[in-house]
Amino acid sequence: MTEQALLTDARLYLCTDARTDRGDFADFVDAAYAGGVDIIQLRDKGLEAAEELELLEVLETAARRHGRLWSVNDRADIASLSGAPVLHVGQKDLPLASARKFLGGEAVIGLSTHSHGQIDAAIAASRGAGGLDYFCVGPVWATPTKPGRAAVGLELVRYAAEAAGKTTAKTTGGAAGPTVDGPRLPWFAIGGIDLGNVEQVAAAGAERIVVVRAITEADDPAAAARSLLAALDAGAS
């Protein structure tokens, strides 16, 4: 499958640090993929570039073994050097146009959003050649991984579901070209999501989720991933 096809089919996205305290990064990411995680992002602000590149090689090996995607947070230079198929940026990180210029048209690029206006802008940025490939909405609930950022609640998840549901595929002939029928722009709910509330997120309209502690703190990452996917299905039914 192409990277875009893998993104379209993705439902469970995991962000993890380097797990330096446990020393089990390779085993952990392999177990997470085995349990059904579709994308794993290495997000660890404390890493030196050389350390991050070394861990990304480990992540790439596991991703290829399972036929899944792997992602770099914030840094287009690291994404380029590592050959990562996915780059995720925040509102204050490298602008989409600059990231696209750096990485080229084949890279999958995602963006964090926290408001109605940012969601609308993300959807608008998906149109045309080199547009945005996916966006995340959150944090739905307060989370220690994003200290100081207020929770946006389920209302913004509902808004994203409605707004993204009105979109079509990327335009032909550049940004000014006519729209064509196709899949909706993929988006993920993120922030404080765990087994206890994932059904609420799904009921609000999210088909895809990003998690951190729900898997990183689990005794059995593979089982945790399977349980989250089952709950995501249950909430949507």
UniProtKB/Swiss-Prot annotation:
- Give binding positions for 2-[(2R,5Z)-2-carboxy-4-methylthiazol-5(2H)-ylidene]ethyl phosphate: 143-145, 192
Q: What is its EC number?
A: 2.5.1.3
Gene3D superfamilies the record matches: Aldolase class I
Keyword Endoplasmic reticulum in record: no
UniProt entry tagged with the keyword Chaperone: no
Example GO CC term: the record gives:
cytoplasm
Q: Which UniProt keywords apply?
A: Magnesium, Metal-binding, Thiamine biosynthesis, Transferase
* Residues the record lists as binding Mg(2+): 74, 93
Q: At the top level of its lineage, which domain of life is listed?
A: Bacteria
Q: Per UniProt, where does 4-amino-2-methyl-5-(diphosphooxymethyl)pyrimidine bind?
A: 41-45, 73, 112, 146
Q: Which cofactor does the UniProt annotation name? A: Mg(2+)
Q: Which CDD domains match?
A: TMP_TenI
Cofactor, free-text remark:
Binds 1 Mg(2+) ion per subunit.
The reaction(s) annotated as catalysed by this protein in its Swiss-Prot or TrEMBL entry are: 2-[(2R,5Z)-2-carboxy-4-methylthiazol-5(2H)-ylidene]ethyl phosphate + 4-amino-2-methyl-5-(diphosphooxymethyl)pyrimidine + 2 H(+) = thiamine phosphate + CO2 + diphosphate; 2-(2-carboxy-4-methylthiazol-5-yl)ethyl phosphate + 4-amino-2-methyl-5-(diphosphooxymethyl)pyrimidine + 2 H(+) = thiamine phosphate + CO2 + diphosphate; 4-methyl-5-(2-phosphooxyethyl)-thiazole + 4-amino-2-methyl-5-(diphosphooxymethyl)pyrimidine + H(+) = thiamine phosphate + diphosphate
- Which pathway, metabolic or otherwise, does it act in? Cofactor biosynthesis; thiamine diphosphate biosynthesis; thiamine phosphate from 4-amino-2-methyl-5-diphosphomethylpyrimidine and 4-methyl-5-(2-phosphoethyl)-thiazole: step 1/1
Give the EC class as a word. Answer: transferase
Please name the HAMAP family in this protein's record.
TMP_synthase (MF_00097)
The UniProt function text for this chain reads: Condenses 4-methyl-5-(beta-hydroxyethyl)thiazole monophosphate (THZ-P) and 2-methyl-4-amino-5-hydroxymethyl pyrimidine pyrophosphate (HMP-PP) to form thiamine monophosphate (TMP).
Q: What is this protein called?
A: Thiamine-phosphate synthase
Q: Which organism is it from?
A: Arthrobacter sp. (strain FB24)
The gene name on file is thiE
